[in-house]
């Protein structure tokens, strides 16, 4: 069914003025926004339960329904009209006529506009074309829309407008609604997996006296009553580890983090993370656990461990690759030798040649990581754990017992994006204090993302943290993967936008 209106397009201000006039008349006649309509049925459920029934079977059953929704389409044909109502579960056609609905009710219905919310009571039947339809016995206007829907109801053509006016995108775009329904299922599947493995879900502070738990710039705010500076959290890590110190040996949190950094297809300053910590585990176990969690979530969201992302087939059902930084660079760039990748001067010369930024005070490990990020990270399309990160860039991770210059840390990459970051936790209070001091020195040398010294966290560690493993998973990026979405803005209902011009 299509909208048959062939009249010239009206100026939006004129349309709004006409709708306001209609609303004024409705107010004059009685209650303009009633709230006593009792909805009993949903379009999707009716389609599921009755969509396959024959015309004759529906006529024999005479199924009474009472449904409400937004009017998306309308076709007036003299003594009868058809409309399509949309609710959260789907769409259904409605048939309004002088004979059954009543002349006055039908005439009022003709004056209603697309976008209005309508309540209908009637019986189900099928048209000659086999479309499930409600034959309306009564119709009521429940809420008047003053602004028109996007033209032709094909959705918003302007991508930025979709993000700024997400409500219109959700009204007119089935794919957008499907993405956010799937996002909810993904988060539900993660919760089920974690609680099924004995983890306790917790909530930790969103405002911190000291920013910590990640290398990032924080948002700063001020508490008036306490007259103190506070920071929106960049990560919950240090508070979650305090809980492990306190005896909660298996904890997780799904919540927002805030980082005062740039916008991109992969970055939003407000984003969702899941972090979990388990006592008496180390990073190799965490990789197995993270792999199993992502498989479980993929099946819950898509029904398969083989998914398509932007034209690439991603296989989540086979063991994820595990490579060191140097091994990964060598796998995708065999022209580079191990000797070159272990040569600080060679690496800095490469950065100069490729005009890439690097931190001059970094040691060999930091330079190798930067080289990996510049040359190889984007090539990790299939799931790959990069392991054994340098200690100098991992201030919260436990050092290797045999190679103290590296840590028991991994990052998981899929489609060239970091999906997870985990490690055996550093539980040596004295080593952690020294690592914090190294971060302080780096900050004093100009590294804005270096961490602060957190004396209270050191005090907690001094009470004893058992051997512990922890991992953080980017929920938004995981949702991007499992919904085939190219931008993080496509999976956040209201992403951060620049000011409108």
Curated annotation (Swiss-Prot):
<dbReference type="GO" id="GO:0000049">
    <property type="term" value="F:tRNA binding"/>
</dbReference>
<dbReference type="Pfam" id="PF00152">
    <property type="entry name" value="tRNA-synt_2"/>
</dbReference>
<keyword id="KW-0030">Aminoacyl-tRNA synthetase</keyword>
<dbReference type="InterPro" id="IPR002313">
    <property type="entry name" value="Lys-tRNA-ligase_II"/>
</dbReference>
<keyword id="KW-0547">Nucleotide-binding</keyword>
<dbReference type="InterPro" id="IPR004364">
    <property type="entry name" value="Aa-tRNA-synt_II"/>
</dbReference>
<dbReference type="GO" id="GO:0004824">
    <property type="term" value="F:lysine-tRNA ligase activity"/>
</dbReference>
<feature type="binding site">
    <location>
        <position position="418"/>
    </location>
    <ligand>
        <name>Mg(2+) 1</name>
    </ligand>
</feature>
<keyword id="KW-0067">ATP-binding</keyword>
<keyword id="KW-0648">Protein biosynthesis</keyword>
<dbReference type="GO" id="GO:0005829">
    <property type="term" value="C:cytosol"/>
</dbReference>
<feature type="binding site">
    <location>
        <position position="411"/>
    </location>
    <ligand>
        <name>Mg(2+) 1</name>
    </ligand>
</feature>
<comment type="similarity">
    <text>Belongs to the class-II aminoacyl-tRNA synthetase family.</text>
</comment>
<keyword id="KW-0436">Ligase</keyword>
<keyword id="KW-0479">Metal-binding</keyword>
<dbReference type="InterPro" id="IPR006195">
    <property type="entry name" value="aa-tRNA-synth_II"/>
</dbReference>
<keyword id="KW-0460">Magnesium</keyword>
<dbReference type="GO" id="GO:0006430">
    <property type="term" value="P:lysyl-tRNA aminoacylation"/>
</dbReference>
<dbReference type="GO" id="GO:0005524">
    <property type="term" value="F:ATP binding"/>
</dbReference>
<dbReference type="InterPro" id="IPR012340">
    <property type="entry name" value="NA-bd_OB-fold"/>
</dbReference>
<dbReference type="Pfam" id="PF01336">
    <property type="entry name" value="tRNA_anti-codon"/>
</dbReference>
<dbReference type="InterPro" id="IPR044136">
    <property type="entry name" value="Lys-tRNA-ligase_II_N"/>
</dbReference>
<protein>
    <recommendedName>
        <fullName>Lysine--tRNA ligase</fullName>
        <ecNumber>6.1.1.6</ecNumber>
    </recommendedName>
</protein>
<dbReference type="GO" id="GO:0000287">
    <property type="term" value="F:magnesium ion binding"/>
</dbReference>
<dbReference type="InterPro" id="IPR004365">
    <property type="entry name" value="NA-bd_OB_tRNA"/>
</dbReference>
<keyword id="KW-0963">Cytoplasm</keyword>
<comment type="subunit">
    <text>Homodimer.</text>
</comment>
<dbReference type="InterPro" id="IPR018149">
    <property type="entry name" value="Lys-tRNA-synth_II_C"/>
</dbReference>
<feature type="binding site">
    <location>
        <position position="418"/>
    </location>
    <ligand>
        <name>Mg(2+) 2</name>
    </ligand>
</feature>
<dbReference type="InterPro" id="IPR045864">
    <property type="entry name" value="aa-tRNA-synth_II/BPL/LPL"/>
</dbReference>
């Amino acid at each position: 069914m299509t909208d048959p209106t062939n009249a010239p397009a009206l100026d939006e201000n004129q349309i709004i003025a006409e709708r306001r006039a209609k609303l004024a008349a409705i107010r004059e006649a009685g209650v303009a926004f009633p709230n006593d309509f009792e909805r009993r049925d949903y379009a999707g459920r009716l389609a599921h339960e009755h969509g396959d029934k024959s015309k004759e079977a529906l006529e024999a059953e005479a199924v009474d329904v009472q449904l409400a929704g937004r009017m998306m389409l309308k076709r007036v044909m003299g003594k009868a009209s058809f409309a399509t109502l949309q609710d959260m579960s789907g769409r259904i056609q409605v048939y309004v006529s002088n004979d059954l609905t009543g002349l006055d009710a039908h005439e009022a219905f003709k004056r209603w506009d697309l976008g209005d919310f309508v309540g209908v009571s009637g019986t189900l039947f099928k048209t000659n074309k086999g479309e499930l339809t409600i034959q309306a016995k009564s119709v009521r206007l429940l809420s008047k829309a003053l602004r028109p829907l996007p033209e032709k109801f094909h959705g918003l053509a302007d991508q930025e407008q979709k993000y700024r006016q997400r409500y219109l995108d959700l009204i007119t775009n089935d794919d957008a609604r499907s993405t956010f329904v799937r996002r909810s299922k993904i988060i539900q599947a993660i919760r089920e997996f974690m609680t099924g493995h004995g983890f306790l879900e917790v909530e930790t502070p969103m405002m911190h006296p000291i920013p910590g738990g990640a290398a990032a710039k924080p948002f700063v705010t001020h508490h008036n009553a306490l007259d103190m500076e506070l920071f929106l959290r960049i990560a919950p890590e240090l508070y979650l580890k305090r809980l492990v110190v306190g005896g909660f040996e298996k904890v997780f949190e799904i919540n927002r983090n805030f980082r005062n950094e740039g916008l991109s297809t992969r970055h939003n300053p407000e984003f969702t993370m899941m972090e979990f910590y388990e006592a008496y585990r180390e990073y190799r176990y965490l990789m197995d656990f993270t792999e199993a969690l992502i498989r479980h979530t993929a099946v819950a969201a898509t029904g398969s461990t083989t998914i398509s992302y932007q034209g690439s087939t991603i296989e989540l059902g086979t063991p994820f690759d595990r490579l060191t930084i140097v091994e990964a660079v060598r796998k995708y760039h065999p022209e580079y030798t191990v000797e070159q990748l272990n040569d600080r001067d060679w690496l800095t010369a490469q950065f100069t040649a490729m005009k890439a930024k690097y931190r001059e005070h970094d040691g060999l490990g930091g330079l190798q990581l930067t080289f990996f990020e510049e040359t190889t990270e984007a090539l990790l399309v299939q799931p790959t754990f990069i392991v054994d990160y340098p200690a100098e860039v991992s201030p919260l991770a436990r050092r290797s017992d045999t190679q103290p210059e590296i840590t028991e840390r991994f990052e998981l990459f899929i489609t060239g994006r970091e999906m997870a970051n985990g490690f055996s936790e550093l539980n040596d209070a004295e080593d952690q204090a020294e690592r914090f001091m190294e971060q302080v020195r780096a900050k004093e040398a100009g590294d804005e993302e270096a961490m602060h010294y957190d004396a209270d966290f050191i005090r907690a560690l001094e009470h004893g943290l058992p051997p512990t493993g922890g991992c953080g998973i980017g929920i938004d990026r995981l949702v991007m993967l499992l919904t085939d979405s190219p931008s993080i803005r496509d999976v956040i209902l209201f992403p951060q936008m620049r000011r409108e011009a």
